[in-house]
Amino acid sequence: MELGKTQRVHIVGIGGAGMSAIAELLLKSGFSVSGSDLSTGDVTDRLTAHGAVIYKGHQEGQVADSDVVVYSSAIRSEENVELRAALKAGIPVIKRDEMLGELMRYKSGICISGTHGKTTTTAMIATMLLEAGESPTVMIGGISDYLKGSTVVGEGKYMVIEADEYDRAFLKLTPTIAILNSLESEHMDTYGTLEELKQAFITFANKVPFYGRVICCVDWAEIRKIIPSLNRRYITFGIEEPADVMATDIVLLEGSTTFTIRAFGIEYPNVRIHVPGKHNVLNALAAFSTGLELGISPERLIAGLGCYSGMRRRFQVKYSGNNGLMVVDDYAHHPSEVKATVKAAKDGWQHSKVVAVFQPHLFSRTRDFADEYGWALSRADEVYIADIYPAREKAADHPGVTGELVANAVRKAGGKQVHFVNGMEELYTALQTHVAPQTLLLCMGAGDITHLATKVAVFCKEHNADH
């Protein structure tokens, strides 16, 4: 891929999931990449190993030799010293999605959208196409075990991209195939209303060329509602609703799921994916539908799905003892994601006590969805709620909004053993009392709770009597 081997790209906020993925893609494509972030860690260390120059913190001089500066939607351009310095120096400043849209010009784009399931579905499609010998270029907002990273630079004609709806970023992309994986209220700080969000998905889907295809999950009511507004060809998939591609005979096992795919009247039995939960069956149906549209044989698609080995922070098992003690780390941060993850744990590990540990993400999301979180978490046997991870928001702008709102909502929804613990060290101490046989410690959230999951896993390894 000849993308101009000498340009230097500087990325502000390079440690974020989406930004680190595009940094990795640029590095593998031959660009010189530098970047800055307020904190460093495993993600930035991996980029350094690939050749990136990483700065901790933001300073004017760090953009001096750049040909272009890229920033994420989470960065406020008027407040960031590097972006101001770049604009003053006449260096082009663009958002991440604009850069991604430019890179997509070289390939046929397969873009996976949806309020949930984007990362897993993107990784499933990538694995499937790689196993089929298609050599795709891939960019995922997470770390794939199979890919050993978040990107692949391939020689084939397809580019598989996770399409993020936040800040309307996905409207800058140019999909040949657009997947609508799920749709419900999310990112209201961007859209204001669900109707505006639905209109954005319609606009995204209708960017597909006349020879392309839109692939829609009809199990989501809001997707069913927007289908009449699509003016491109589409196919449907689902479990609960009649669709072109469906799954039946679903068997939920510990760590894997088996099912039959019925596609356009033809049945394909004994499909196995090595991840738990019905929500992952839907993700697999999206991938299978995409492969059919590309003309790949069903047998090769099923074999490819069987090679999918999961994502970091997507029901990632951090510790598993012989006595049934487990620690799981998951990125779930929307009520529907939390509900699906808790359900996967309860359905797949029916003889285990499921202890859900949840860190709310964003004050606004916690305020808007506290009751929904309550219902989502109430099925767990015991629940711990951490305080809110603020991300781009400030506590002062949201008085009275704390993790206690979620804890109270869980109690209201019927949760019997519910604890609000303010402080990660205090939470770590509390979880140590649950190091016992047949216990699944399920840590969920998009913030730094992942570090707690790792710490608890280390404690289990050192103190569990049977590992």
From Swiss-Prot:
Compartment(s) where it occurs, according to its Swiss-Prot or TrEMBL record: Cytoplasm
Reaction(s) the record says it catalyses: UDP-N-acetyl-alpha-D-muramate + L-alanine + ATP = UDP-N-acetyl-alpha-D-muramoyl-L-alanine + ADP + phosphate + H(+)
Keyword ATP-binding annotated: yes
Residues holding ATP: 114-120
Enzyme Commission identifier(s): 6.3.2.8
Family membership: Belongs to the MurCDEF family.
Protein name: UDP-N-acetylmuramate--L-alanine ligase
Gene designation per UniProt: murC
